[in-house]
Amino acid sequence: MLTIEDIKKIIPHRYPFLLIDRLEELEDGKRAVGIKNVTVNEDFFNGHFPDYPVMPGVLIVEALAQVGACAILNVEENKGKLAFFAGIDNCRFKEQVKPGDQLRLEVEIVRMKGPVGKGRGVASVNGKTVAETDLMFAIK
């Protein structure tokens, strides 16, 4: 298991935009599984929505991308580089994510060709899929 401090050595994201709390699994260049504990204290709940707090879907996708970036950037030749979003395809939101949920974020890197990679991300709460998407990364 990798802690938040370990994650910060791999990706450059910091509060308030670091959206993963720990990595439970990391296979360099292949896959990673992260956890985000969603609390009522998240800044985005102030406006999304004040009387009905729901985690924005785009932030779930960003959390998946951060997990995928950990898998890609922990490969020796990519250490110290940045992974940028290059595309999002086939994105679906299936359930709402609310305060108190523990978001499991699983990303499998399905292809790397030069500085471009593709991954498949699935976010779940209590074993139920809440979002899924295909991600494209560009390494710089």
Swiss-Prot record:
Protein name: 3-hydroxyacyl-[acyl-carrier-protein] dehydratase FabZ
One cellular component term from this protein's GO annotations in UniProt: membrane
Annotated function: Involved in unsaturated fatty acids biosynthesis. Catalyzes the dehydration of short chain beta-hydroxyacyl-ACPs and long chain saturated and unsaturated beta-hydroxyacyl-ACPs.
Signal peptide (from-to): none
Known EC number: 4.2.1.59
Pfam family for this entry, one: FabA
Keywords: Cytoplasm, Lipid A biosynthesis, Lipid biosynthesis, Lipid metabolism, Lyase
Single Gene Ontology MF annotation: (3R)-hydroxyacyl-[acyl-carrier-protein] dehydratase activity
Residues of the active site: 48
